[in-house]
Amino acid sequence: MSKIVVALGGNALGQSPKEQLDLLKSTSKSLVSLIDKGYEIVISHGNGPQVGSINLGLNYAAEHKQGPPFPFPECGAMSQAYIGYQMQESLQNELHSMGIDKQVVTLVTQVQVASDDSAFNNPTKPIGLFYTKEQADKFTKEKGYTFVEDSGRGYRRVVPSPQPISIVELDSIETLITHGTLVIAAGGGGIPVIKENEVYTGVDAVIDKDKTSALLAAHLQSDQLIILTAVDHVYINYGKENQRGLDEVSVDEMKKHISDGQFAKGSMLPKVEAALQFLEKNTKGSVLITSLAGLGDALDGKIGTLIKN
């Protein structure tokens, strides 16, 4: 039985609970079709917009004395539960409609990072909503946040994004898979924790979900990693007149595109880097990068970027 890790992008899940649920309903059809064809899948997801909104809302309440401030790791855990719940509901309903008897479980997942990771001094991970430059400058002045321009879509707050070292709940994930459970894990890249003297402590950061998904896929010895985002292909010369979507490319070709500066930091670059990390550990595997809405067409080979060694 072929094993696939599917990583859904947080930006591709929409900007509201209703929009997210509607998108997940259609995506669940494609995911369950994989199960129906005999594939074993594990699902991860991003949380950039969602965790930013949760953190912003709770901070607003705290500033207006309507509740306590919440640390970022707790906000990450809330986003895992919120997104995981909607995924579970959509997948359970679709499994039932297909006559497939399978349990779906969301596992709150911690991921270990290094306390001395250089990312803590160089925030790069976009979270939350898109703002105008004027709005971003106002937040920077009032709250000390760092903002960057995000691929022509506006300005977003950025936070540290350390490298994932290990998945704390990996054994539990494997146990659930062994018992035939459809597992949703490592949401938002996992809740970042550091380990000192055998004690885990959460830290203020957001791990790139694609890099954690690549780590998970490698540990599970998956045959394929599917990264779902907001665009149908990986593009070179993105946003220019000579923009071109990549179909099937080799690892060496992708490395050249990276060296040529083709992919934006905090956007497509970490997805491509995650793909290469997985293929370095599983030389016989493959990575498919495509849009959430276009997953069905991508599985039929009509769209998407397929990366192989």
Swiss-Prot record:
GO terms for biological process: arginine deiminase pathway. PANTHER family: CARBAMATE KINASE, CARBAMATE KINASE-RELATED. NCBIfam families: arcC, PRK12352.1. It is an enzyme of class 2 (transferase). InterPro entries: AceGlu_kinase-like_sf, Asp/Glu/Uridylate_kinase, Carb_kinase. CDD domains: AAK_CK. Its EC number is 2.7.2.2. Belongs to the carbamate kinase family. GO terms for molecular function: ATP binding; carbamate kinase activity. It catalyses: hydrogencarbonate + NH4(+) + ATP = carbamoyl phosphate + ADP + H2O + H(+). It comes from Staphylococcus aureus (strain USA300). Pathway: Metabolic intermediate metabolism; carbamoyl phosphate degradation; CO(2) and NH(3) from carbamoyl phosphate: step 1/1. This is Carbamate kinase 3. Keywords: Arginine metabolism, ATP-binding, Cytoplasm, Kinase, Nucleotide-binding, Transferase. Pfam families: AA_kinase.
